[in-house]
Swiss-Prot record:
Its EC number is 3.6.1.-. Its main location: cytoplasm. The gene is rsgA. GTP binds at N160, K161, I162, D163, G214, Q215, S216, G217, V218, G219, K220, S221, S222. This is Small ribosomal subunit biogenesis GTPase RsgA. Keywords: Cytoplasm, GTP-binding, Hydrolase, Metal-binding, Nucleotide-binding, Ribosome biogenesis, RNA-binding, rRNA-binding, Zinc. One of its GO terms (biological process) is ribosomal small subunit biogenesis. It is an enzyme of class 3 (hydrolase). The lineage of its organism: Bacteria, Pseudomonadati, Pseudomonadota, Gammaproteobacteria, Enterobacterales. Zn(2+) binds at C298, C303, H305, C311. Belongs to the TRAFAC class YlqF/YawG GTPase family. RsgA subfamily. Its cofactor is Zn(2+). It comes from Photorhabdus laumondii subsp. laumondii (strain DSM 15139 / CIP 105565 / TT01). Monomer. Associates with 30S ribosomal subunit, binds 16S rRNA. InterPro entries: G_CP_dom, NA-bd_OB-fold, P-loop_NTPase, Ribosome_biogen_GTPase_RsgA, RsgA_GTPase_dom.
Amino acid sequence: MAKHKLSKGQQRRVRENHQRRLKKQDNKPEMDDNQLGEPQEGLVISRFGQHADVEAEDGSTQRCNIRRTIRSLVTGDRVVWRPSLQTQADVKVNGIVEAVHERTSVLTRPDYYDGIKPIAANIDQIVIVSAILPELSLNIIDRYLVACETLGIEPLIVLNKIDLLDEESRAWVNEIMSTYHNIGYRVLKLSSHTGEGMEELTKMLAGRITIFAGQSGVGKSSLLNTLLPEDEEEILVNQVSDVSGLGQHTTTASRLYHFPHGGDVIDSPGVREFGLWHLTSEQVTQGFVEFRDYLGGCKFRDCKHRDDPACALRKAVEDNEINQERFENYHRILDSMDQIKPRKTFTDNDS
C-alpha cells in the first residue's frame, strides 16, 4: 500500500510537535552537584537516546544521563562520569556523563538527508570479513578498503570458510589475496567451523577495539559467537550487524562487547553499509593506496583515468604495476557514486 505524502500543513504540525517535545525534554532538571559523587573514568558501552550505559572502572555497567552540553556521544567514547547519590523516581539512572575525552577515531555513517552521523568512537581496526561462498566479491572488499582509508582506521581482510576449498581452489584464492598483501594490507584466511586461523585472529584482536564488516552470509555471526563468551553469544545471534547493507539487522543501538582473550568489538547495526557517495572522486582515488605513487604523473591535471591520453594510472595498469581488477573496481565505485545524489551537501563539520 502506497504511503500518502504529507501536506505542507501536516509537515508543519509534525515539526511543531517535535520542537515541543524537545523543549519539554530541555526543561527537565539535570542532577545537582550535591546529588553526585566524585568524577570517574568510564567507557560508553551503548547509547539510548538521552541515556548511556557506561562501564565504570570496577567493571560494572551504569545507566547515566548525558549533560546537555555534550554535543556528541557514541559507543566507544571514553568519558568522565559521576555516580548519583540518589535514585530518580521515574528513571533508574545511576549517574551522569560529564565530559568526553578526545577521540582517536570515529566511525561515521553518511545519511541521505542529514549528513554524516557518528556511530562509534575510538575504533582501532575494521575486520572486513569475506568468504568464497556465497561469493568472493573483490568489489565489496575494495569499497570497504576505501572507507577504511578515508576514516583513517586500519583494515584487516579476513577470508572465512576456507575449509570449503580444495587444494586447487586454495591456490586460486591465495593468488587473489596476494594482491592485497602486496600493497600492504593484512590478510588472514580462516574457518570459524574448523578453528583454522582462529588463534591468529584472537591475537590480532587483543588490546584493540574492532568493528566487523562484510556482506550477508560470510559468517560474521559465527566468528563472533566463537570469539565471545557463552553468555553473550545469544545476544549476538540476532544482534550482529550487517555493515554491508546486503542483509537485515534487528538491533537499534550500537553496543560494545569484551573478548575473553583481550580486545573489544562494537556491534553497530546503525551502519548498514560504508556508503561512499558522500565522498569526492579525489577521496576515492586516494583510497586506493597503490595509486598514490602515480597521482600527479598524468599529462592533464583533470585526468579522469579513463581514455585520457598519457594517463599515469592506466600506464601502470598496462605495466602490471597496478592490479587490473582493482583499477576496474575503482571506476565501478565512481560510477555508482554518480547514480546517487544526496539531499545534503557534506562538509567536514558534519562529522
